[in-house]
A protein has these predicted regions:
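N-terminal alpha-helical interaction modules that lie
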Residues: 1-141, 146-160, 228-263
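Short amphipathic alpha-helical surface patches that mediate protein-protein
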Residues: 68, 172, 219-220, 239
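Secondary-structure boundary/capping motif
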Residues: 69, 118, 164, 203, ...
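TPR/Sel1-like alpha-solenoid repeat signature
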Residues: 121-124, 152, 167-170, 200, ...
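Alpha-helical adaptor scaffolds
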Residues: 155, 159-209
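Glycine/small-residue-rich hydrophobic helix-like segments
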Residues: 199, 203-238
Length: 263
């Protein structure tokens, strides 16, 4: 896999993911059905549009750099590019931890400046959640990361109730905490439940029915919560995810991951 500036190149054909000119706005609603990100506006709109074009085409490093260069308004695209790249393409756990910590720090800065920016909270939760998975859920909970993730997701959903990706993340948060500490302690200490996990996954699928990652995350969550009793549902969700036609680089990575899991 070729490297550019330390970031691995996108490993798939991206010809179908190029949204030049007006194509970006025309396809925006479909491309952002998961994160409910508004189309760029303001003085830096053109630069941020270009950053999103790079992101959707799989140039995560280019998108990150362009987003950072655009200032606070570009932080969402920069942070999402960093999150997706590190989740799927970065191979070093140490690099991942550093990147997720940096995303969380930028999100705090953005939250202070733009208190109604839902993705400033969602991406903080995503980064902290992935960071917690890397260091271990038990250790993350002991460090108070669980509470930060929960609060960030609650805020994101309060600001944008139709944020499908935040519902996915909340479902996974509930499932992982219960898997680690059990239903009773999970509910008493962190306010999580199996019912809340399933409810959030279901909401995500209703809001974004063409989402592959909603299905794979739900499949993983169901297995964490119910084990082999839900294996038929788990397998069906993975099969559905693997059959999707991706519309951008992130979705391509989601579908590829689903296919790999089924092999």
């Amino acid at each position: 896999m070729a490297k550019k500036g330390g970031w691995a190149a996108f490993p798939h054909d991206n010809a179908a993911f190029v949204y030049d000119g007006a194509a970006l706005k025309k396809n925006w609603a479909r491309l952002h059905k998961g994160d409910a990100e508004p189309f760029p506006s303001g003085d830096s709109a053109k630069a941020i549009e270009q950053a999103w074009r790079l992101y959707h085409a799989g140039d995560f490093e280019g998108a990150y750099e362009a987003g950072i260069k655009a200032g606070l308004d570009g932080y969402n695209v920069a942070n999402k590019a960093a999150c997706i790249y590190n989740n799927y393409l970065e191979t070093s756990d140490a690099n991942k931890q550093t990147a997720y910590a940096a995303v969380a720090a930028r999100c705090e800065e953005l939250q202070a400046a733009q208190q109604k920016n839902a993705n400033a909270y969602y991406l903080a939760a995503y980064a902290l959640g992935r960071y917690g998975q890397l260091i271990g859920v038990a250790k993350a909970l002991a460090q108070g990361i669980g509470g930060k993730v929960s609060k960030a997701l609650e805020t994101a959903l309060k600001l944008e109730p139709k944020h499908a990706d935040a519902h996915i993340a909340f479902g996974t948060f509930n499932a992982e905490v219960i898997e680690k500490v059990g239903s009773m302690i999970g509910k008493m200490t962190y306010g999580v439940s199996k019912e809340a996990a399933v409810e959030n996954y279901d909401k995500a699928l209703k809001l974004n029915p063409e989402s592959a990652v909603a299905r794979t995350e739900m499949a993983d969550g169901l297995y964490k919560l119910f084990g082999d009793k839900k294996m038929k549902d788990v397998e069906a969700l993975y099969a559905e995810a693997a059959a999707f036609e991706p519309k951008d680089a992130m979705e391509c990575l989601d579908v590829a991951a689903a296919k790999a899991e089924m092999e």
